[in-house]
Amino acid sequence: MNIAIFGGSFDPPHNAHDAIVKAALLNLKIDKLIIIPTYLNPFKTEFGADPKKRLVWCEALWQNLDKVEISKFEIEQNRAVPSLESVLHFKKIYNPDIVYLIIGADQLINLEKWYKFKVLKKLVNFVVASRDDIEIPSNLQKLNINVKISSTKVRNELDFCQVPKAVLEDVIKFYKEKNAR
């Protein structure tokens, strides 16, 4: 069995996240894609939408796709969870032959700062989703995603044109109410 893990804040989920999910299902030889909304990104101190709201958005977008599992694992920990901990958790459950860990190209600059990175890189095959013309080393597998958007831009500019229709109304309502406070 081969699994892929795609963790993120999904604050909010947008078309690039959706493209990554669909590209992973199409291009990776996997039996399961585990999407993990974080409780809190280990490199951040706060979130815009609470974890349960982000989980609901992820479920609305992807839970009905074949081979996809939306995991509550990190949210249930009520703390920032390093990727290594999530990888070990799912290795214990599924005993996979291969674990792909999907990251955005913007994470490459911080990758060696990740908790126990040297251990993590022995356990997973990194798959990097292209972003903003960031060069991806040739030794890493690449997912070609040509959607230029970030969750930060959506939140800060209330620019919802790249939010998938399945969650658009709820995302707009949430962030407009949050910014009105």
From Swiss-Prot:
Keywords per UniProt: ATP-binding, NAD, Nucleotide-binding, Nucleotidyltransferase, Pyridine nucleotide biosynthesis, Transferase
Catalysis performed (reactions): nicotinate beta-D-ribonucleotide + ATP + H(+) = deamido-NAD(+) + diphosphate
Any Gene Ontology biological process: NAD biosynthetic process
Gene3D superfamilies: HUPs (3.40.50.620)
Annotated pathway: Cofactor biosynthesis; NAD(+) biosynthesis; deamido-NAD(+) from nicotinate D-ribonucleotide: step 1/1
Enzyme Commission code: 2.7.7.18
Function: Catalyzes the reversible adenylation of nicotinate mononucleotide (NaMN) to nicotinic acid adenine dinucleotide (NaAD).
Name of the molecule in the record: Probable nicotinate-nucleotide adenylyltransferase
Native species: Campylobacter fetus subsp. fetus (strain 82-40)
